[in-house]
Amino acid sequence: LIADKADGMATKNFTVQVGGGVDSVCGELTCNFPNWSNSKFAPKLFYEDINSDGLKDVIVALISGAGTGISTKEIHVLNQVHDPYRRYQEVPVESINDAVQRLVKLEQKGNEITALIGKKKYVVDYTKFGYQTPVNPPGVGAIENYEPYNGILYGTTNVFVTIPEALIGNIKVRYTWDGKMYR
């Protein structure tokens, strides 16, 4: 993963290079992404098959925002294809926040925060954490992460009840490939 330095710790104009070097049999493949940017710290790079086609994909998690108690990410997936030449194609990935909005219903009644995920219901009493002034409704997304594990892409984000973000739990989303995007 190669990028130009923008300013401070920020980087932009990314190039993904796969293969190459002395041991390369097929040569290297490079893909340029001039609109990608990373605000701080090092991005995460993974090389794993996450759509069960037997071909390793490139997963890049860029930091889109960072500060005290905040770390938001932008996820990019390059699916490897052979048609008949080996290449990588960027495919859409639903953001963790969009996935949570679609899959999770959060509500607050008194001291209790309820998360409805499908048919499962989770209830947390936020006062047991020592928080006094909750946000209504509870929020998500101040800390985000994406990572593949055993061939599956996961996204996680936190649930908070006060500003600054007072964590009461995390939500983990398992992504699947529907042939057009990861959701």
Segments from the language model and where they lie:
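Beta-strand C-termini and the immediately following turn/loop, strongest in propeller blades
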Residues: 61-64, 116
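Short glycine/acidic-enriched loop and turn motifs that connect beta-strands
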Residues: 64-68, 160-163
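Short, surface-exposed coil-to-beta transition loops
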Residues: 42-43, 59, 71-74, 139-142, ...
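Beta-propeller blade repeat segments, especially FG-GAP/WD-type strand-to-loop junctions
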Residues: 3-6, 14-21, 70-92, 174-183
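Acidic/hydrophobic-patterned starts of short beta strands in beta-sheet-rich repeat architectures
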Residues: 50-62, 149-157
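Acidic, small-residue rich beta-repeat scaffolds with periodic aromatic anchors
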Residues: 4, 83-85, 93-183
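Beta-propeller blade termini
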Residues: 41-50, 142-149
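Terminal domain-start segments
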Residues: 1-42
